[in-house]
């Protein structure tokens, strides 16, 4: 059977940064080709990069959130493109603004079906939320790493809240060993 850690795939990386000054988004939107700005729908300007694929949400405060990237390297590359585009518009941007990863969303596959009712009881109700009438996944909150894992009956997992790519590997290890301890990964 394949090691579940080998199935881990980064689905989304969200990071934030800022340029330390307020922006006139209306004027930026007019000068920045491909920018979407509709303040009645959303307070930020949306600028999409194609290579790597991501979206930068640029706010009047100068704060920028990058979402949709598939790796932390892609986040840095996407934001470098955004910074360069802003500099092209004569907007002052520091040489190397701090970029903080806020959330890494990953998926993985345990490779077998899971009995979520048994898992809910085995893991203890203080660490989980499981209401199949509301949502088909079991929500499992881990402390170390500080992530939330969604477990589905198919054996698929979604791990959210990670700050480092290794957080997902660590979470999968802990989930697998905990389920094995409880005898809930057999067959």
UniProtKB/Swiss-Prot annotation:
Task: Quote the SUPFAM superfamilies the UniProt record gives.
Answer: TATA-box binding protein-like
Signal peptide positions (record): none
Q: Which CDD domains match?
A: TBP_archaea
Q: What highest taxon heads this organism's lineage?
A: Archaea
User: Which biological process annotations from GO are given for this protein?
Assistant: DNA-templated transcription initiation
Keywords, ordered alphabetically: DNA-binding, Repeat, Transcription, Transcription regulation
sequence repeats (start-end): 10-86, 101-179
InterPro entries, per database record: TBP, TBP_archaea, TBP_dom_sf
Keyword DNA-binding listed:
yes
Q: Name one GO molecular function term.
A: DNA-binding transcription factor activity
Q: What Gene3D superfamilies does its record include?
A: TATA-Binding Protein (3.30.310.10)
**Coiled-coil zones:** none
What does this protein's UniProt record list under function? General factor that plays a role in the activation of archaeal genes transcribed by RNA polymerase. Binds specifically to the TATA box promoter element which lies close to the position of transcription initiation.
Q: Which PANTHER family match?
A: TATA-BOX BINDING PROTEIN (PTHR10126)
| Family matches, as NCBIfam families | PRK00394.1-2 (NF001593), PRK00394.1-5 (NF001595), PRK00394.2-2 (NF001597)
Q: Which family does it belong to?
A: Belongs to the TBP family.
- Can you say what this protein is called? TATA-box-binding protein
Species whose genome carries this gene: Natronomonas pharaonis (strain ATCC 35678 / DSM 2160 / CIP 103997 / JCM 8858 / NBRC 14720 / NCIMB 2260 / Gabara) (Halobacterium pharaonis)
What gene is this protein a product of? Answer: tbp
